[in-house]
Amino acid sequence: MSSLEVGVLDFGASSLAGSVAVDRALIEAPFRPDLLSLVINWQLAKRRAGTHKTKGISEVSGTTRKPYRQKGTGRARQGSLRAPQFRKGGIVFGPVVRQHGFSVNKKVRSLALRSALSMRFAEGRLFVLESSRLGESKAATLLKWFASNAELSVGKKFLIVTEEKNEGLLRAASNLHWVKVLWGSSANVYDVVLHDFVLLEKASVDVLVKRLLK
């Protein structure tokens, strides 16, 4: 298994604390904008409730009587006051309750996530994060660290990926709208692309390797 060196950020320090070897297949996948677009659309489609609904001509309330006789009035023929051209008439081809989701193969989703991580690594915006004090952090501590670290840019969005759900870090980051915390099993293409920097907890790298490469 070949690997690449990824910079390590120590939580609390203001510069790189060294580097760590990460599986090359995880962070050097080919750039596939077509798959990134497909998987992002797939994620967003699944979130849609699909509960929007309009009434058609057969569903709106009103009389079924023909408004006036077919011939002899000089007006255009009409068969129902519930037709779409009338006020309070039914809607033609309006939205109906449905599922917007569609299926994407697991291998495609895996390649898209590796492509997104590789994109951030190629940009120099993917780091491994030392995790010894992550669970003890406060919002003020996070804010101070992001502002003082030379490798990170102020005013950008940050995605922190931990090994498993970290309640302490989630509470701290909830007060910072530009920081999002996920865990290895929930890391996804949309959030990697949405955020400018990706910080992987050391233990989360193994979770991602097992999830995406096995």
Swiss-Prot record:
One of the primary rRNA binding proteins, this protein initially binds near the 5'-end of the 23S rRNA. It is important during the early stages of 50S assembly. It makes multiple contacts with different domains of the 23S rRNA in the assembled 50S subunit and ribosome. Keywords: Ribonucleoprotein, Ribosomal protein, RNA-binding, rRNA-binding. Part of the 50S ribosomal subunit. It holds the Pfam family Ribosomal_L4. PANTHER family: 50S RIBOSOMAL PROTEIN L4, LARGE RIBOSOMAL SUBUNIT PROTEIN UL4M. This is Large ribosomal subunit protein uL4. HAMAP family: Ribosomal_uL4_B.
